[in-house]
């Protein structure tokens, strides 16, 4: 079945230690084989896979990129009078149409990170229970500005917020919000975690805060995967279904 209208936005590679197993190349190959138009990489607390990810996708898009480059050269030649043709305007329009068609066929690498968000400030490391805890948050770059802001957030999480894990906080997220899309994440996310603890008013507060900061770029994440492995934590699936019901209600 063609999966072109479905894209994975929460994905861990082998760079998510103890949580991801798949290599970047195999993930991309599988997504392409399934007819998907793109895939995100959102490793835990780091962006170590991104260079390998973008390089491999560029390699897979090599043929298409070559055609686009040739068409753009031809457009420039026609517009510069270096290539003669009966109807220059029509020829340029045809080339531009082909460029758009080819660009739509390119596989899209979506750069992201599943960050850890400190309940208080990222620099608070006093040994209190709150400082040892953290919430998961999927953060995606939707443009170049978002990519640079994501790099700043992740870098600062390591250099200033590290306490058991590299952490950011709400203040930093608001400071570097431009160009970012955020998702509420798995059961480790702030909203799901508060729902499972019965802290519904706190869960609503978190939703309202993220909505006020990120607007239409904030999404509540539903998860429906059921593990078939005997050793898996099957309680997590039932718990996620209960969380899903509440998330749908909030949305």
Task: Map each language-model feature to its residues.
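Phosphodiester-processing cores and adjacent nucleic acid-binding clamps
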Residues: 1-251
């Amino acid at each position: 079945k063609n999966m072109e209208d479905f894209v994975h936005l929460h994905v861990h590679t082998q760079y998510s230690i103890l949580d991801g197993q798949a290599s970047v190349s195999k993930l991309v190959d599988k997504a392409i084989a399934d007819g998907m138009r793109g895939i995100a990489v959102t490793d835990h607390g780091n962006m170590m896979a991104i260079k390998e990810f973008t390089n491999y996708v560029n390699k897979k898009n090599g043929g298409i990129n070559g055609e686009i480059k040739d068409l753009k050269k031809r457009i420039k030649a026609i517009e510069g009078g270096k290539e003669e043709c009966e109807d220059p305007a029509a020829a340029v329009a045809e080339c531009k149409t082909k460029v758009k068609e080819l660009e739509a066929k390119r596989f899209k690498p979506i750069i992201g990170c599943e960050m850890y968000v400190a309940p208080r400030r990222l620099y608070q490391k006093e040994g209190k229970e709150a400082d040892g805890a953290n919430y998961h948050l999927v953060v995606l770059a939707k443009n170049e500005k978002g990519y640079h802001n994501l790099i700043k957030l992740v870098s600062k999480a390591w250099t200033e917020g590290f306490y058991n894990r590299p952490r950011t906080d709400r203040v930093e997220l608001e400071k570097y919000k431009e160009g970012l899309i955020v998702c509420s994440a798995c059961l480790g996310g702030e909203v799901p975690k508060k729902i499972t603890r019965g802290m519904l008013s706190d869960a609503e507060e978190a939703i309202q805060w993220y909505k006020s900061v990120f607007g239409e770029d904030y999404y509540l994440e539903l998860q429906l995967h059921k593990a078939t492995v005997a050793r898996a934590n099957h309680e997590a699936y039932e718990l996620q279904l209960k969380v899903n019901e509440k998330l749908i209600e909030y949305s």
